[in-house]
A protein has these predicted regions:
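Noncatalytic, solvent-exposed loop/strand surfaces
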Residues: 1-184
Length: 184
């Protein structure tokens, strides 16, 4: 409770080492881990009270390919998430947990710490190895480009207007569409 600081609800099922940020949408909050074990839980916020572990408030759960470092990304009803040391991207319907695409092994990348971002109908994934992948995610997952940058990336990209900001270990990059007809 924001006014009193009292705990409203709690839910077990994740390890104590949760790095990825939770994602909220469609009346649910989704939290995940994969350090000690792999787990992702979707919790219905309405009516959540007390210890909801194993209750009907937990709408769905996954036990494989869950993220450790990169946070999941919600685009409409699609929840995208990365298995950070394997370069595997998965997608589920946030409402049901049912597969909505993938899993896809991403080309050229293995280690991903940065969270994926989406803008202009495109999905962006940046790897520790300096590879920035751009996908069309409207129908499946289609690779549009793979950009090799002379840097390593742990920070998540930021979309600002029609620009994409990437913070590498050595440089800050600003990528912008080449023409007004295309967008970030």
């Amino acid at each position: 409770d924001l006014e009193t600081g009292q705990e409203l609800w709690q839910c077990g099922g994740l390890s104590r080492n949760v790095v990825a940020s939770p994602v909220a949408g469609h009346g649910l909050v989704v939290a995940a881990n994969s350090y000690d074990w792999q787990a992702m839980l979707a919790i219905r916020l309405e009516g959540a009270k007390g210890d909801i572990t194993g209750s009907e408030q937990v709408v769905w759960s996954l036990k494989r390919l869950t993220p450790y470092v990169p946070s999941p990304l919600l685009v409409g009803q699609k929840l995208f998430f990365l298995r950070h040391l394997q370069g595997i991207l998965s997608c589920v319907d946030i409402r049901t947990g049912e597969t909505a695409g993938g899993p896809w092994r991403l080309p050229l990348v293995r280690m991903v710490f940065a969270s994926p971002v989406a803008a202009g109908g495109r999905l962006y994934v940046v790897s520790r190895e300096g590879i920035a992948l751009v996908f069309d995610h409207q129908q499946g997952l289609n690779l549009l480009s793979a950009n090799h940058l002379d840097d390593q990336f742990s920070a998540s990209p930021a979309v600002v207007g029609d620009s994409l900001l990437l913070r590498g270990d050595r440089y800050l990059y600003c990528l912008k569409a080449a023409s007004q007809e295309s967008s970030v």
